[in-house]
Amino acid sequence: MAVFSTNLVIYKFTDFEQTFVLEDSQSNSAKDLTGFTGTCKMQRTLNLGSLTAFNLAFTNRALGKVRITLTSTQTANIADGKYFYELMLTDPNGVTERVIEGVVIVKHPVTYPSDPPLTPFVPQVP
């Protein structure tokens, strides 16, 4: 299976969800993912730093559908910035390959207060 590259945007304090539909590169039809396992992780620098794991679910194995998610609690704990991610699948024979990769941009939504809340400055008058 060829590696597909796509970029993602995640907003802190919100739930994140992305569904991918994988195709068999030889037949151009849905990739049957019966018996496959998978992981999807992101990190700030390639091959360095801590990893953040996405929740991964096969929503329809016969049609090649894989969903990655993060809860609002998980996104709240990710620093704003640029990350790299990859989705790895392992077939029933134990062969692991990267099927999707790309850049993740984590943003702080404008409509949410900064974390932690700011204390208002009150000047003292002598």
Segment roles from a protein language model:
Residues 1-126:
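Contiguous segments within soluble domain cores/interaction surfaces
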